[in-house]
């Protein structure tokens, strides 16, 4: 955005003008997040408004203590390492006791490098096979369903 003289807030507000009507409540995820111990913070390359809009549609707004959006990351997107370090600092996070979930495998490489446990959510649309192949060694877990994965965590199976 800097290279093209575009205001990042304006750009992100335009990019996130989406039809949210296809998103519905995720009751299973809601239940698993209620049970899951510890702070739950969203780290996203999206802006705050888009994130809140999606959380509202999923009925998950009360599940998270905070949101680290692209603006808080100084408009530096994942997988750049500096925002991960900022995230750790801003929220006083112990990386060794933190799990990061992402649906883009390469975003978990720096997460693993700073000490997080990494979980790739294979949503079936990742078409960067080279990124997945080169990221595999950084993925502690893979799942196709975050609710089922959290259910296993909550039961102590993982």
Locate predicted features:
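A metal-dependent, Asp-based hydrolase signature
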Residues: 1-17
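Asp-based, Mg2+/Mn2+-dependent phosphohydrolase catalytic module
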Residues: 34, 47-48, 52-158
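Short glycine/proline-enriched coil/turn segments at helix->beta-strand junctions
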Residues: 3-7, 36-40, 114-116
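A short hydrophobic/aromatic micro-motif that marks alpha-helical segments and, especially, helix-coil
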Residues: 9, 20-23, 95
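Exposed alpha-helical structural elements
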Residues: 7-11, 28-32, 148
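Short, solvent-exposed polar/charged micro-motifs at secondary-structure junctions
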Residues: 2, 21-23, 151-156
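Short, acidic loop-to-helix structural element flanking the phosphoryl-transfer center
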Residues: 15-42, 47-52, 81
